[in-house]
Amino acid sequence: MNNVIKKVDLTDAKSSNLVALIYSNEVILVEEAFCPNEIKLKFNEIAILSAIKTAHIMKVSIRKELEAIFHDTGVLFVKHSVDYGNSQSITMHFEQFKKLQNAIENLNKNR
C-alpha cells in the first residue's frame, strides 16, 4: 500500500479519537477507543455516501462486509468479519464527514 498522503484528525467533543489516514485512492478511518476499530473507504464510496445522505436513505450496503446506517446527526459504519464472526463499527458525525470530504477535495486540487 502507498504511504499516507495526509492524516486528518476528526476527533470532536461528541466522539472517540477518530483519525482519517488518506492514501492515494482510499481512506482508512481509525477510531482509538477501548477496542480500536479500522474501516477502509474508497474515494468513490465517500462520494456515493454523500449523495445518499442527501437522499435521506437510512441504510446502504457499501460492500459485502460493510454497511452504512444514517441517523439524524451522522453515519454509523459497520464492518462485518465473516471469518471471525464479529463486527467493528465507527460513528462519524456529519461535521466530521464534511471535514474529511474537504481534506480529500483539497488534496485533489493540489495534485
Sequence positions of predicted segments:
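Positively charged, low-complexity terminal tracts
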Residues: 1-111
